[in-house]
């Protein structure tokens, strides 16, 4: 027959295991999209690094390589991966025009297991003769077998605040 001390140890072990399981479950339900948020944030970081190296082709890898990709901005809507890529290359023909890109104020809204809307601000720090520019963006992301990709980008420039 187990002693009082052995029973107490067994009860404490069971209690510790139960609390551990409950704590793990509550953490995973607190943010069910934490891995997705991290994956998308990583892709945005890769884009930022590629842009700051002057590599538009590498920057474009976060976009869905499809004729159904869309980009909306002040010059209208471009349709298709190649059209979006051409738009970037025409608008930013050299490193000085590209400047240094920073993203900030990211907001994530998941529309299900395979969809997300990411809002944020972008800022290009450029030489004085080009001038800094920035604005806001809305990116619609979709999960594909190869990972998350931007399927629609709506980017707007904002007038600098004085």
PLM feature spans:
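Bacterial N-terminal signal peptides that target proteins for export
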Residues: 1-11
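Short, low-complexity N-terminal intrinsically disordered segments enriched in polar/charged residues
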Residues: 12, 17-62, 161-162
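Short beta-strand edge/turn micro-motifs at domain boundaries
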Residues: 27, 134-161
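A solvent-exposed, acidic/Ser-Thr-rich amphipathic alpha-helical stretch
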Residues: 34-41, 56-114
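Solvent-exposed loop/turn segments at secondary-structure junctions
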Residues: 76-78, 124-125, 156-158
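Hydrophobic/aromatic beta-strand elements that line small-molecule binding cavities or substrate pockets
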Residues: 88-89, 103-109, 122-124, 136-142, ...
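Short, cysteine-centered beta-strand-loop-beta hairpins and adjacent loop/turn segments enriched
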Residues: 95-97, 124-132
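A short hydrophobic beta-strand element
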Residues: 113-122
């Amino acid at each position: 027959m187990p002693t009082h001390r052995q029973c107490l140890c067994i009860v404490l072990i069971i209690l510790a295991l139960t609390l551990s399981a409950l704590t793990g479950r509550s953490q995973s339900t607190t943010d069910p999209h934490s891995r997705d948020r991290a994956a998308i944030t990583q892709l945005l970081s890769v884009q930022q690094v590629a842009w700051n190296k002057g590599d538009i082709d590498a920057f474009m890898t976060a976009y869905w390589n499809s004729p159904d990709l869309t980009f909306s901005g002040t010059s209208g809507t471009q349709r298709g991966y190649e059209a979006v890529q051409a738009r970037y290359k025409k608008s930013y023909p050299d490193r000085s025009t590209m400047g240094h890109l920073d993203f900030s104020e990211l907001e994530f809204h998941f529309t299900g297991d395979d969809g997300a809307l990411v809002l944020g601000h972008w800022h290009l720090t450029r030489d004085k003769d080009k001038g800094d520019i920035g604005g806001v963006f809305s990116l619609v992301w979709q999960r594909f077998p190869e990972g998350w990709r931007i399927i629609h980008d709506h980017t707007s420039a904002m007038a600098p605040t004085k």
